[in-house]
């Protein structure tokens, strides 16, 4: 007489579920702490590019082998309180001098202002000059008249090692690549 197959025991099946849950938790941990950073936009400082309440993913590996470039949108630790994450656009690069005249941004005494076609409304005001230290960056929001950015911080510059990632995708409320 042959013995009837009964399948795995309840404990064996439970153990398989536990292993699967642990595997998923480890994968999510790796994705969230090594590959991606998840951020919510708390203010209007980046509007019209990214709106208040949007959720974005940043690529944590973007600056492992290269430096941030002008106009990259980055997620970083706020220099005046590193417990807060900010998202802004890179404007001034290491070693440059940034001056803002009548709301227009000039780099190193250039006669031509930077392209600001992404700015929400015509910016106002004069600021600077700001001499960006080596290894640091000068940040501005796209909604310049409503942005708390490098112009107003006690520590005006963001060190490269405080940049956590390059914003690449808005995933809520609807998916959109960030440029």
PLM-predicted stretches and their roles:
Residues 2-15, 30, 34-40, 48-179:
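Soluble "head" domains of membrane/secretory-pathway proteins
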């Amino acid at each position: 007489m042959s013995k009837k197959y009964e399948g795995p025991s309840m404990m064996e099946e439970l153990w398989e579920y536990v292993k699967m849950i642990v595997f998923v938790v480890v994968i999510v941990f790796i994705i969230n702490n090594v590959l991606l950073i998840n951020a919510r936009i708390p203010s209007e400082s980046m509007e019209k590019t990214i709106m208040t309440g949007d959720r974005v993913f940043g690529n944590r590996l973007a600056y492992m082998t290269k430096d941030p470039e002008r106009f990259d949108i980055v997620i970083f630790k706020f220099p005046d309180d590193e417990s807060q994450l900010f998202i802004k656009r890179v404007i001034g690069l290491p070693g440059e001098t940034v001056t803002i005249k009548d709301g227009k941004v000039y780099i190193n005494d250039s006669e031509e202002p930077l392209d600001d076609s992404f700015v929400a409304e015509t910016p106002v005001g004069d600021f600077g000059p700001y001499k960006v230290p080596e290894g640091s960056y000068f940040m501005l929001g796209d909604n310049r008249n409503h942005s708390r950015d490098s112009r107003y911080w006690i520590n005006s510059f963001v060190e490269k090692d405080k940049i956590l990632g390059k914003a690449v995708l808005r995933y809520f409320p609807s998916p959109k690549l960030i440029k």
